[in-house]
Amino acid sequence: MTKKYLFESIVKIRDFECDMQGVVNNAYYHNLLMQTRTEFLESIGIIRNEWSVERGIDFVVYETAIQYRSPIVAGETFRSCLNMHREGARYIYIQDFRRESGELCMRARVDVAVGLNGKLTRGEIFADYMKEHGVEFQEQPASRRTNSKIPNHIDDVIYDYEMKVRDYECDRYGSATNAFVQRYLEVTRLEFMEEMGETFRKWHENGVDMMVSKVDLKFIRPMMAAEKFHSLMNIRQDGPRVIFEQEIRRKNDMQLCVRASVEIVGIVDGELDTQGACFFHFINNQVPEWHSKNKM
C-alpha cells in the first residue's frame, strides 16, 4: 500500500464474530476499532487500565462515524490501519480496514476526549506524553463536524422500543460498550420492521438486501448496567438511501444518552439501486399506513 499510517495491525475474523450470512456484524466493528486503538496506545507504552487506575486518566469516545464499503467475512485476514490528529481538545482517529490487495473495506472517524478524575480536559496530558515519546501527529484548529448526518433532534418519533442494559453488555466501568449501543439501535430497527410484517430476511428472499452503508453516533451520556431506556426512531428517504434517525433516552428522566443516524442502501439482485426505487412503496405507503394506526 502506498498510504502511510501511524499504526497497523493484522486482524483475522473468527466465525463467532459474524452473523448468519458469515459477515462481520456492523456493531462488532466497534470492538475491532477499539482493539486497534488499544494496541496503538500499548505500542507507545500506554496501558489504558493502568492509566485509569493509577493516574485517573481515561480516553472517552465522543463521536463515531463508520462508512461500510465491502463486507468482511469469516476467515478473512485484513490490515487495521490508524492515523491520528488533534483538533482542539479532541483526538481524531481515522481508521481503515484494508485487505492485503489494498481494497478499503471500512473507514471510521472516532473522536476521543481525555478525562482526568472524571472530568474532561483539554487533552494536554496525552499530547505531552506523545511528544516525549516521539509520536508525530498534526494539530489542527478545532472545527465543527460539517459532514455529520446526526440530527439535533427527531422531529417526529414514529417508534419507541423499551430496553434494559444488561451486566454482560458493559465494560469494567459498568457502562454499555459502544458495540452494544449500536446493537440496541439495530434491535430497534428490526423490531420496527417486524411490527410492520417485514424482515430483512423476507426482503432478501425477494432479491433485495438492505445494507447499512454509514453509521453516525454521538455518545452524550453513559448507559449504565440495569438502566431501562427508550430507543426512539424516525425513518425517511433521501435519494437512494433510507435514513433511520435514532435516539436513546433514559427511562427515569428521559435524559438523552445517544444520537444516531443510520443510512441504508438497497442491493437488488446484487446491484446497488442508485435510485432507491426498491424502498418507494415501503416508505411512501407502508410506513405512513402503519404510523396512522399506531400514532404515539
Segments the model singles out, each with a brief description of its role:
Residues 168-258:
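Structured core of small recognition/catalytic domains
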Residues 45, 197, 264:
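Short, small-residue-rich loop/turn micro-motifs
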Residues 7-9, 68-77, 81-151, 219, ...:
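HotDog/MaoC-like acyl-thioester-processing domains
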Residues 55, 60-64, 76-80, 211-215, ...:
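A generic structural signal for short beta-strands and their flanking turns/coil linkers
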Residues 1-40, 140-198:
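Catalytic strand-loop segment that frames the active site of acyl-thioester-processing enzymes
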Residues 8, 61-63, 92, 160, ...:
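Short coil/loop residues immediately preceding or within conserved phosphate-binding loops
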Residues 1-69, 73-75, 194, 273-296:
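Hydrophobic, helix-prone linear segments
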